[in-house]
Amino acid sequence: MTDHSSTPTGSVSGRRLLLTGGAGFIGSHLTERLAADNEIVILDTLRRNALVSAGLDKHPHVKLIQGDVLDPAVVRQSMEGCDAIIHLASIAGVDTVLKNPVLTMRVSLLGTMNVLEAAAAKGGVKRLIDFSTSEVFGRYAYNVTEWDATTLGAVGEARWTYAVAKLATEHLAMNYWKQYQLPACSIRPFNIYGPRQVGEGAVHHFIVRALRGEPVQVHNDGSQIRAWCYVDDIVDGILLALEREQAVGHAFNIGNPRSTLTIYSLAKEIIRLASSSSHIEHVPWKQADVELRIPNIDKAKELLAFQPLIDLEEGLLRTIYWYRRHLDAP
């Protein structure tokens, strides 16, 4: 198995970091990597909480504040003493976005404004990482670079409220750097999966159904193509962006273009690796969807020395192992 302990990210130590949305899937993995050598403050509504299953909720270096980035006073309080901010808080998951388009935009737009305003006013922040999305590239994104034009869907399609709000936060982060010298950068994650991905996501749904012997439901014919990135790899990318001066003022695609598969093939692979008796069931999906999404990560390689390490089979096996131990646990 690939070991991330020897990657360049081990240099992050002796810091006090604020993670907004830090109790979520990716935030819990960041906390797990950072908590031994740093103080971590997590601001989260706890709508979803992956910290408990990771055993991090009682960690002596982790301070959890239950609150909302929409509350400027709570944001300012959470930021006290912190010299780095990783802003992950958002409404996550396509199904949730479709049901809550206004809240999706409020949390991304107003929440990010609150974080940027507080950080700029506070001073002493050495790095702010804004979490964006690969959805800014729209429905067709093949080998896309950070210099390619972003593409959004039609107004009125609720799915794109997430993407348009995230694209706006990228512009905000870049211009807080240019206008106020707040050292910010943005991360565009491409289809992250792994243990503790509770709630939504194709890998989550497919593994849960496969382990229960239920039909694995694929939208339409399953020909949609994705590049899948294991969570440990994006944690590497985030921590490199935290440490490297070259990151400031840039957006970065973080993903694994080597692990590319159709949704249908992903479902088949999960059924195989889980030794499941499940079959694939095609279900209609009439909402907007992304047909093709594969990143070009040359910029992250050049400026951050980022390199994804976990291939798809290894990542899926690790994830299935975690779900076997935690599925239906109290």
Region locations from a protein language model:
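Generic structural signal for alpha-helix termini and adjacent loop/cap motifs
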Residues: H29, N49, N100, A118, ...
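Solvent-exposed, non-membrane alpha-helical residues enriched in polar/charged side chains
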Residues: G67-L70, R76, L116, M174, ...
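NAD(P)-dependent short-chain dehydrogenase/reductase
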Residues: Y140-A149, L167, H171-L242, P257-R258, ...
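N-terminal Rossmann-like NAD(P)+-binding domain of SDR-like oxidoreductases, especially those catalyzing
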Residues: M1-R188
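C-terminal substrate-binding subdomain of Rossmann-fold SDR/epimerase-dehydratase oxidoreductases
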Residues: G10, A210-P330
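Short-chain dehydrogenase/reductase
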Residues: V97, F190-N191, A251-I254
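Residues in well-ordered alpha-helical elements
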Residues: A73-R76, D83, D95, V102, ...
